[in-house]
C-alpha cells in the first residue's frame, strides 16, 4: 500500500479501487438489550429499537472467511418477508431505511458482495428507484475487530440515529467500478447530515429523524447476520400509545437523569477523580456467610427453577 503512495492511516479503504485487505484490530463492547416495558419502568435510555435480527448460513465457499449472499434470506418473500413485516409493525417501510452500516472489510471479495446483497434486498423489499442508500464503512476508522466488529457497528449506527449525521469514508478516493454501477448507493467521503439541524437556517428542509438503518456482518465460518435498528422515537410512540403521555414524561426524566449521571461519572474517571472500573463486590451468593459455599449456591441456583433472591439479598434454592 505504501508503494502505491497510500499513507498508513488510509490502508483500510473500503469500496475503493485500490483497496488491499483489512487492517487488524482488537476490541469488544457490550450492548444492553431490554424489553420495552423494563426500559420504561427503570427509566433506561433507549438508543434504538431492534426491529429485526437474524443469522443465516452463508453458503460453502473457497475459504472459511469468504462471504456469500446468505443474509439475502432476510428478504425472502419480498414485501411479505419477516423483515418487512417486523419493520412495518414499527411504522417503517423500505424507503425509510436511510443507510447500511456495512461489514466493509476493504477486501476484494467482501465489499462488492455486500453491496450486491443490499441492492438485491432493497429491491425485494420494494425500495423506490432513486431513493439513495448511504454506505457507512466504519472499519475504515476502527479496523476489523473480528468478534467485536458488529458491536462497534451497533454503537456507530445508534450514534447516527441520535445525531442525524452519517460519517464519511475519508480513505475513499475512487469507488471501484463493480460497486459504482449498483443502484441506490451513495458513498460519502465526508460526514453528511441526513436529518435534524443543519444548513444556514439551522435545519434540513422537510427532514425528520433517520428512521432506520441496517447492519450486516458477513463471512467467517460461512455465517452472516443482519440487524435492523429503528429510531428510539418508535419506543416513545409505543409507550405513549400503551400508557399515555405522563408515562413518556416520567421515562424521559429518568432516562435523562441516567444519561447525565453517566456523563459526569465518565468525565470524572477521565481526569482521575473516580474509578472507571470497579470490581464486583458480592455476587449475592452468600460469600459473607461461612455456612454457605458460594460455589455450591451458584450451581444450585442455576439448576433450580424455583431459586429466588431473598429479602436478605442472597439467592436461595429449594434445598
Model-found features: residue ranges?
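Acyl-CoA/ACP chain-elongation machinery
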Residues: 1-23, 53-74, 102-112, 129-186
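Condensing-enzyme catalytic core mediating Claisen C-C bond formation in acyl metabolism
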Residues: 4-92, 98-99, 228-295
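Short Gly/Pro-enriched turn/cap motifs at secondary-structure boundaries
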Residues: 20-23, 216-220
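Active-site-proximal alpha-helical scaffold in enzymes
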Residues: 23-44, 144-169, 180-202, 224-233
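Short, glycine-/Ser/Thr-/acidic-enriched flexible segments
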Residues: 37-39, 55, 105-107, 140-142, ...
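Extended non-globular C-terminal regions
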Residues: 85, 303-319
Amino acid at each position: 500500500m505504501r508503494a502505491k503512495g497510500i499513507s498508513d492511516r488510509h490502508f483500510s479503504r473500503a469500496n475503493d479501487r485500490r483497496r488491499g485487505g483489512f487492517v487488524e484490530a482488537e476490541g469488544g463492547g457490550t450492548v444492553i438489550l431490554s424489553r420495552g416495558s423494563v426500559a420504561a419502568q427503570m427509566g433506561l435510555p433507549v438508543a434504538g429499537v431492534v426491529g429485526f435480527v437474524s443469522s443465516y448460513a452463508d453458503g460453502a465457499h473457497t475459504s472459511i472467511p469468504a462471504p456469500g449472499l446468505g443474509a439475502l434470506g432476510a428478504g425472502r418473500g419480498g414485501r411479505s418477508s419477516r423483515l418487512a413485516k417486523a419493520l412495518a409493525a414499527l411504522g417503517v417501510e423500505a424507503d425509510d431505511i436511510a443507510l447500511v452500516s456495512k461489514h466493509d472489510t476493504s477486501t476484494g471479495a467482501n465489499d462488492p458482495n455486500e453491496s450486491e446483497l443490499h441492492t438485491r434486498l432493497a429491491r425485494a423489499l420494494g425500495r423506490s428507484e432513486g431513493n439513495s442508500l448511504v454506505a457507512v464503512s466504519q472499519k475504515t476508522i476502527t479496523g476489523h475487530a473480528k468478534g467485536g466488529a458488529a458491536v462497534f457497528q451497533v454503537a456507530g449506527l445508534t450514534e447516527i440515529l441520535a445525531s442525524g449525521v452519517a460519517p464519511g469514508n475519508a480513505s475513499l478516493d475512487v469507488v471501484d467500478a463493480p460497486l459504482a454501477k449498483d443502484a441506490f448507493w451513495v458513498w460519502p467521503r465526508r460526514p453528511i447530515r441526513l436529518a435534524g439541524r443543519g444548513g444556514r437556517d439551522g435545519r434540513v428542509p422537510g427532514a425528520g429523524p433517520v428512521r432506520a438503518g441496517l447492519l450486516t456482518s458477513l463471512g467467517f465460518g460461512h455465517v452472516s447476520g443482519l440487524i435492523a435498528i429503528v429510531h428510539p422515537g418508535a419506543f416513545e410512540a409505543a409507550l405513549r400509545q400503551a400508557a399515555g403521555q405522563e408515562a413518556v414524561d416520567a421515562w424521559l426524566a429518568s432516562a435523562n437523569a441516567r444519561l447525565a449521571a453517566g456523563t459526569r461519572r465518565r468525565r470524572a474517571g477521565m481526569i482521575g477523580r473516580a474509578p472507571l472500573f470497579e470490581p464486583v463486590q458480592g455476587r449475592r451468593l452468600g460469600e459473607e456467610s461461612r455456612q454457605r459455599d458460594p460455589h455450591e449456591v451458584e450451581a444450585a441456583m442455576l439448576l433450580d427453577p424455583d431459586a429466588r433472591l431473598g429479602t436478605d439479598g442472597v439467592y436461595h434454592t429449594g434445598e
